[in-house]
């Protein structure tokens, strides 16, 4: 079943212009320090080595974003090359506390489909809407599109140390996402403090058998 799902989503992403990547399962701590994960997500990572005693420290990847952005950085690009869409079926590792583990929705190793887009400002609206369309297509094919809720996950300005970037950029980005969701006529709630440390996001959630919402797509 996993192989069929992987083949299906990869074929669909390729049709939509995604470039397939295959990135390592771990990296030196240097990469995570550049991306901000070392300062803001280290407790959720499996770290290999000790910074005080070892010359090199590695960590298993908790997400693919630093790796795919490094793929982009490895070559020189013109603005004419954009948008660039990277897709990967990624096996990830997160050092979840035992009390946070839950069924197959909160585990320490899992495989998901990840995509990262490099776009010009004038391309942002179209690319965002195309991402939502891809998510909705997947939900429709899997037969769960009627059971989901949409959430604009925002930063908490009263907890600034949790995030990177300045307030103006955060507020502008949240306003752009809000406007695009409204243009798509998608009902959504706004959840303060649920953003990633690096930016706001749209979470697509579904209720499990216990009535608790789990995030299916971000």
For the regions a language model picked out, list residue spans one by one.
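TRNA-recognition modules of translation machinery and tRNA-sensing kinases, especially anticodon-binding
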Residues: 1-218
């Amino acid at each position: 079943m996993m192989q069929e799902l992987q083949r299906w989503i990869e074929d669909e992403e390729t049709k939509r212009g995604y470039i397939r990547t295959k990135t390592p399962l771990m990296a030196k701590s240097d990469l995570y320090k550049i991306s901000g994960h070392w300062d803001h997500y280290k407790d959720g990572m499996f770290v290999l080595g000790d910074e005080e005693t070892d010359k090199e420290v590695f960590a298993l990847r908790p997400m693919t974003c630093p790796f795919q952005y490094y793929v982009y950085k490895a070559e020189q690009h013109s603005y004419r090359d954009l948008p660039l869409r990277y897709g990967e079926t990624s096996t990830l590792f997160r050092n979840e506390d035992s009390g946070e583990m839950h069924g197959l929705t909160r585990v320490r190793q899992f495989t998901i489909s990840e995509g990262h887009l490099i776009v010009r400002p004038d391309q942002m609206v179209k690319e965002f809407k195309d991402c939502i369309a891809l998510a909705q297509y997947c939900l429709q094919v899997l037969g769960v599109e009627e059971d989901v809720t949409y959430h604009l996950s925002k930063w908490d300005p009263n907890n600034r140390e949790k995030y990177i970037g300045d307030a103006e950029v955060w507020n502008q980005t949240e306003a752009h996402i809000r406007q695009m969701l409204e243009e798509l006529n998608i009902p959504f709630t706004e959840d303060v403090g649920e953003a990633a440390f690096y930016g706001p996001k749209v979470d697509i959630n579904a209720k499990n058998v216990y009535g608790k919402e789990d995030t299916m797509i971000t």
